[in-house]
Amino acid sequence: MLICFIFILLIPESATCPAECVCVDRTVSCVGQQLTEVPQNIPNDTIRLDLQDNEITKIGPNDFSSLMNLKALQLMDNQIVTIHNQSFSSLVFLQKLRLSRNRIRHLPDNVFQNNLKLTHLDLSENDITVVSDAQLQGPEFLEVLNLDKNHIFCLENNVISSWVSLEVLTLNGNRLTTFEEPSNARFRQLDLFNNPWNCDCRLRWMRKWLEKAEGQNKTVCATPLNLQGSSIEILQDKFMTCSGNRKRRYKKTCETAEICPLPCTCTGTTVDCRDSGLTYVPTNLPPSTTEIRLEQNQISSIPSHSFKNLKNLTRLDLSKNIITEIQPKAFLGLHNLHTLVLYGNNITDLKSDTFEGLGSLQLLLLNANQLTCIRRGTFDHVPKLSMLSLYDNDIKSISEVTFQNLTSLSTLHLAKNPLICDCNLQWLAQINLQKNIETSGARCEQPKRLRKKKFATLPPNKFKCKGSESFVSMYADSCFIDSICPTQCDCYGTTVDCNKRGLNTIPTSIPRFATQLLLSGNNISTVDLNSNIHVLENLEVLDLSNNHITFINDKSFEKLSKLRELRLNDNKLHHFSSMVLDEQSNLEILDLSGNNIQCFSSIFFNKATRIREIKVIGNDLLCDCRILPLMSWLRSNSSHSIDIPPCQQFQYSDNESDKQRCAAFPEETCSDDSNLCPPKCSCLDRVVRCSNKNLTSFPSRIPFDTTELYLDANYINEIPAHDLNRLYSLTKLDLSHNRLISLENNTFSNLTRLSTLIISYNKLRCLQPLAFNGLNALRILSLHGNDISFLPQSAFSNLTSITHIAVGSNSLYCDCNMAWFSKWIKSKFIEAGIARCEYPNTVSNQLLLTAQPYQFTCDSKVPTKLATKCDLCLNSPCKNNAICETTSSRKYTCNCTPGFYGVHCENQIDACYGSPCLNNATCKVAQAGRFNCYCNKGFEGDYCEKNIDDCVNSKCENGGKCVDLINSYRCDCPMEYEGKHCEDKLEYCTKKLNPCENNGKCIPINGSYSCMCSPGFTGNNCETNIDDCKNVECQNGGSCVDGILSYDCLCRPGYAGQYCEIPPMMDMEYQKTDACQQSACGQGECVASQNSSDFTCKCHEGFSGPSCDRQMSVGFKNPGAYLALDPLASDGTITMTLRTTSKIGILLYYGDDHFVSAELYDGRVKLVYYIGNFPASHMYSSVKVNDGLPHRISIRTSERKCFLQIDKNPVQIVENSGKSDQLITKGKEMLYIGGLPIEKSQDAKRRFHVKNSESLKGCISSITINEVPINLQQALENVNTEQSCSATVNFCAGIDCGNGKCTNNALSPKGYMCQCDSHFSGEHCDEKRIKCDKQKFRRHHIENECRSVDRIKIAECNGYCGGEQNCCTAVKKKQRKVKMICKNGTTKISTVHIIRQCQCEPTKSVLSEK
């Protein structure tokens, strides 16, 4: 005995803990380890065992036999089907058992017999159908029993009644029709939702219980019919009746249910469940069953081990269900089964172990399914099979190895399959020649030479392979059938040539053996998953150049690990996502030239590790901070072949100011956001379904290549035309049953392929004149069930393809303007005779289809209630002489006259405009420029700014910190406590208390915890990132930046490489001329004179002077930014130009106790003037200045008055009346522009000198004080500002670039430049550029009914030559002899004129030619 004891002590601790688990202080955690069975070597003294989130399928009798001390067992989220009746017999101290979210179908009797101390049992979300007393007996003090979301139709309650401690019983989502009241239970929670309750006398107890409970209003009756849908708690007892037969029929036991499952019938040893609406295979089947009939149900899946106890079963019929999945070993245990009927289902695939255990099977019917192949090993387990029907599937070929064990096969049905009768099916033809097993009349589909030939009549020598045909079906036993060469293309070797074939889409049937795919010179617009390029794993070269591609799905090239060359040049790409490149990409050559790409994300270049040649010339690359990723990549790959346009004017170094400057640039154009499916929606095969998803707005992230979009049954009230018109491939759009009010002009203008548009049952009141502009392909339009009164003819003028239109159930106003519609639908026969007139009364209820022209008259005025449907301004909503401007059918803007504000200009600007009173206090004007605040309860102070302290008598416990609220307080608890007063202690490692950081795993230990850290972290709470820079030395002065299990060397300017080992590149700027080298242009560009050694300076934005050394503008974008100038005189004028889109921000501040301040509030200038006469005087500008355009602001102080003028608007005056008559400060104060120092801002806000102390976000320029221009480089203090405004405002606001686009450019004096389209020039792109080009291409030459044998190089002249007097024409041609082939089979030689040179020539008139 002593020897044994010593041996136990010598066993290492790790030997008693399974390798997949973590064992800490009697707790064993094996969560998420993909375990398929309960691990061995679990310590015997374990108290808690966590096995959730694994793949365990069964619990054996001895799995927990040694764990007698176990108190908590977690087995949820596994695949458990089987539990032995002795599985838990040793767990005598078990208190909590969770078996939820498994696949348990049946509980053994007495399974919990020894678990007397069990208090919590969770069996929810399984497939249990019957729960009997014998299954539940054992526990004596059960408190919680969860049975939610099973298929329970019978529940015995004798054991449940005996549990006087039972507080929670959940039965939601089952199939219970009745449940007898448990006699002794005192439920705290009883959940009964979603059961088909039969509300008779037996449920009166339930009604009384629900009447007292709260939140149980979803418990409704299913039967009898007169009570269907009624909430049980509101019924009266007199309606809940029972007949005598029903009372006698009710039994308190599930014994009969165990014998024969509902709703089946059992006769002898046959179980008949035909046409019973079953959605799953019944579990409680009698063991003596020999035949089961389950045909014509709704079963979709056959789980593993579904029939394992039915050893006597000989026939099983599962035909005419909707089975899509047969799980592995589904029929295991059916050793005597000789007939299996599976025809008429939706089975697409069979696993190799699907029929394991069916050694006696003789007849197998798999006809009328959707099988595409037969895998290797599928029939290895059925050696006695004599009859196999695969009739009416989609099988193309069968490998010989698949049938090698079917030695007894005598009958095979293969008809109605698209068989490929090539060399890979010759083996079957040889067997059929010997045994004649194929008797169904199967025919060949491919190759073309054998199409429609009967399989049984073809000799084996006809089954041949030509060229690459042997590759097509070579791997049929792996369910892979390759494609033949597309009809539009030519295939030679492994090259597929589809160049210049006029293709609109990529052929979907490209063979996988292709190594080169050439698709140049077509009309392809999208590259999506439908093209199947992503499956061409052998592809090495892909040429998609010279197409119209605007969109590439992120996963289109995902699996092309062998792709070395990708050509996408000369397309219309605006974005190239890094998602297109796989992490393991071997791409070496990438051509993106001639697109519309503006920039690339840094992630893209992180993946482009093997690219040695890249071309992006001819794109719209932005020469600003967004080109940094490309510049950085170039520095690290300078030896590579690059074809990239230089950005001569953009300079960047790695200093802090440049980093901050570039950090603020917008990233939208460079983002890597892929084309995902919208939230809540489903996307499949370019069809997006968002029906009935409670959407309140048009969803984002809809794939650009979507063809069908379903948005019906939502709450959408507006269609964003910009987002919708990106979906240019859309053919069907369903917006019915929403809350749309109007259709605006050009809402669908880009949807040129849309054929069906359904907008029925909305709240449409208005169609704008161009509502359906662009819908030339529309055939079906439904506007039924709306509130439309007018149908403008112009809205329907583009509907040239319309065949059906529905406008019934609308409030149509049929005056003379509706006559056209009646005439139109009569001539086109497109309306079904449902639409009727509602107004005027003279034609009320008149069918439009049968109305006569004389009935449509304009004799009376249109009622205002109808006219305002499309123009709300007719109601004159704007006040105080404001001008109403209609912006859409249901929207308008009131342009207020100066001095008024509000949606309808109903309010006059006064001292209370800025809501100066805090905490919802009431503001009342006392006199011009002054106000009083009337506080709400709980506040006090001049501005009601002080909150009365409610923490004086707080009841916070356990170290909780009291936080004062309004008329209340809250307790901020320490980490381990919760509750209103921190009175409840939390358990560690729960959702509410997990101290482990950085994804560390929390393990509870006797009231405390331990953290198991993720790789890269350490510390008690995994709070410390392990320093990966410890042994790293960055070169050339670089500094190491620690990451998570990684590091980066932050290099000095010009250096690159992993360790900053790559020296700086050569200066890429053009060499300056001698004259410019001696210049000092400061913040500008030197322009040398061509005729002398002199030069001039072209200043950058924000600078002026002969040497560009005077700073005239300053940008504000950083927190705490400000400029400090010399003190302001008591009486003086300061003028500035402001550009901003912000609603708030400091403009200027001067003073201490006495002050003048100007700030933005709601986009207006708020001026506060105080010279010592309390209270301060307030004034707001009558106009807003935050529209992004430049505004000239002038502020003048003179004694008690302060004057404000914005642009050329009238001067506004505010007076601080009282004894003091001049603005005098205590000390020498600076004049602050754009913001305040932190201490000054806090003080100014505390004393209500300013409402908001944030710095301005925008630009201030051309500052003058008393008409003297200020050089901002001479400011006393300059903190966190920008030298110019290019990074803070949009200088393109309000700029019209005509035939081009405006881009911000810090190097331009005006801050912007117009980038003209290819055929235009000039400062604003309003001058057409003279240009005549020869455009070359390769195509067939056509003459009458003859075509050239080969494609030939030809050209056309295109361009603009300055007007009608000149034209772009060919001035040099050559002749070429070309061989032609004609439709009648003859050939000839034709002479073709090939253009060699194009230029502008005078236009020849017809008269001059004569």
Swiss-Prot record:
Q: Which domain of life is it from?
A: Eukaryota
Cite the LRRNT domain residue spans from the record: 17-43, 259-286, 484-511, 677-703
The set of disulfide-linked cysteines is: C873-C884, C878-C894, C896-C905, C912-C923, C917-C933, C935-C944, C951-C962, C956-C971, C973-C982, C989-C1002, C996-C1011, C1013-C1022, C1029-C1040, C1034-C1049, C1051-C1060, C1076-C1086, C1081-C1097, C1099-C1108, C1259-C1285, C1292-C1302, C1297-C1314, C1316-C1325, C1332-C1368, C1346-C1382, C1357-C1398, C1361-C1400
The GO terms describing molecular function are: calcium ion binding; heparin binding; Roundabout binding; signaling receptor binding
Q: What does this protein do?
A: Functions as a ligand for sax-3 receptor during larval development. Acts via the sax-3/Robo receptor to direct ventral axon guidance and guidance at the midline during embryonic development.
What is this protein identified as? Answer: Slit homolog 1 protein
Q: Which residues form the LRRCT domain?
A: 195-243, 417-466, 619-671, 810-859
All residue ranges annotated as the CTCK domain in the record: 1332-1406
